Amino acid sequence: MRIKRLPESLVRKIAAGEVIHNPSFVLKELVENSLDAQADRIVVEIENGGKNMVRVSDNGIGMTREEALLAIEPYTTSKIESEEDLHRIRTYGFRGEALASIVQVSRAKIVTKTEKDALATQLMIAGGKVEEISETHRDTGTTVEVRDLFFNLPVRRKSLKSSAIELRMCREMFERFVLVRNDVDFVFTSDGKIVHSFPRTQNIFERALLILEDLRKGYITFEEELSGLRIKGIVSSREVTRSSRTGEYFYVNGRFVVSEELHEVLMKVYDLPKRSYPVAVLFIEVNPEELDVNIHPSKIVVKFLNEEKVKKSLEETLKRNLARKWYRSVAYEEISSRALSVAEAPSHRWFLVKGKYAVVEVEDGLLFVDLHALHERTIYEEILSKKSWGKRRVKRNITVVLSREEKQKLEEYGFSFQGEEGALKVIEIPEFLTEDVVEEFFRDFPVDEKLKERIALAACKLATKSGEFDEEIASKLLDVFFKKRFERCPHGRPISFKISYEDMDRFFER
C-alpha cells in the first residue's frame, strides 16, 4: 500500500480517540472548560452511566456565537497564544482539542450566552458537523450536552463498560474536581436523581471530610512552604487505611495528576503492611515554569523540572506531620461521656482564641472547641426539635418552580407560595431563615424524606462566622456543649478535641 495523506475527518476521529476514552473523560473536559470560564456553580447530569448523555451546565462567562463556532474546531483556544505560554500554564485546558474531539464522536448541543448578549446561541452538532444554529434563552453561562458517545465509532461504542461501571468512573472523575475547588458549588445527577450536591465550603479540608468519610476516623492537616514549593494536605492517620489506592489524590497547581513518583513517596513515609493504603489528598504548588503539563492529551500526567526536589520536600513534609500522630489520634477521640457544665467542671478556666476557638481546662487535660462548628450544630438541633415553625413574610421577589406535591411538602415546614404549581412566588418562609439563605436553598434542593433536615442544615449558615465570637456567646455555647456532648457539626466536621496531660508529658519526653 502506498503512503498517502489521511482525510481530515479521519484524522479528527483518531485525535478524538486519544483524548476521549469514555464518558468520564467527556465529563472531565467539560468541567475543566467550565472552571476555566470562571464558573462558581457547575451541574453535571448523566444518563445510563453517561453512555446516553453527559450534560454540563455552568454560570461562567459564556461564549459569543463566533467563539462557540470556533471552539468546536481543533486547536482553537483562549488559554495560550505562543510557545512561551506553555511554560506558564495556569488554566485546566490549553491544547484546544477537547470540545472539538467530543463533538467529532457524538451528537452534541451547545447553548451559551455572554453577559452582553441579549439571547443565547444554540448549536446542534453531529459527528463534528454543525447541523443547526439558532437563538434561545438562558442566563449567562454555557451548557454542553453530549449524547450517543462514539455513535460513529461502533467498536469504541461497544467497548464501553456497563452502565454501573461507567457511572462509577464518572462519579470518581467528578469528585476529583469537587475536592480541589471548594469555591464552586457542584451538583451531580444520574438518570434524573441528585446523587451529590456540594455547596461551597470555607476550605479544601472541609470538602475532603464531606467526600472521604473514612478520613473522619483520624486525620492530619498541614500547609507548608519549603524549597520554593507550597504543600498542603489532609491525610489519614496510620490506623485509617484502604485496601486499594482509591483514596489517593494528588494535585499539582490545582490539576489532578496520576504520579507513581508521588505515590512511592507516600507509601515510603507511611510504611504500611502489604495491600494497605492511606487516604490522602495532597496539593503541591510549583512555579509553572518548572512543570511540563503537555505530556499527554489527557493532561493527567505531568513532569517536574526538578523531580527530586519535589519528592524530597513532600517526604519531609509528610514525615514531620505524621510524627504528630499521637496528637491527632488522641485529638479526635470522643470527649468524656460525663455531662458537665463549664461551671460544674472540676477545672473550668477557659479562654477565647482568635474569636474562633475556646480552650477549656478540664480535669485531665485541655479541651479545644471549634465555636463555629458548635454553633452550627446547636442551631441545627434546636430547629429539628421544634414541633412547628413560625413564619415571616418575604420582602424580595423570590420565584421557584415546584410541582403541586413539592409545594404541599414545603408548606408543612413554614413556607407559603402564590400559585398552585409551576413558577411560584415565595410569600412566607420559616421564621429562622433569612432571604439570602432561602435563595441559596432553592438553587438546589430535593424534596424528599429528609426535607426537614435539609432546611435545618440551610439554617446553619446563620451561625456566627469563625473569628467573630465574643466571650458572652462562647460561654453560652460551651454550656450547651457540656450538656449535649455534641461530637460533630451537621456537615461532619469534629467540634472538639482533647489533649491529656499524660500525652503532653509524653510529647515533651518527661
From Swiss-Prot:
Matching PANTHER family: DNA MISMATCH REPAIR PROTEIN MLH, PMS, MUTL (PTHR10073), DNA MISMATCH REPAIR PROTEIN MLH1 (PTHR10073:SF12)
Alphabetical list of InterPro entries matching this protein: DNA_mismatch_repair_CS, DNA_mismatch_repair_MutL, DNA_mismatch_S5_2-like, HATPase_C_sf, MutL/Mlh/PMS, MutL/Mlh/Pms-like, MutL_C, MutL_C_dimsub
The keyword DNA repair appears for this protein: yes
Pfam families per UniProt: DNA_mis_repair (PF01119), HATPase_c_3 (PF13589), MutL_C (PF08676)
Annotated protein name in UniProt: DNA mismatch repair protein MutL
Highest taxon listed in the record's lineage: Bacteria
GO BP terms, alphabetized: mismatch repair
Similarity annotation: Belongs to the DNA mismatch repair MutL/HexB family.
Keywords recorded for this protein, A-Z: DNA damage, DNA repair
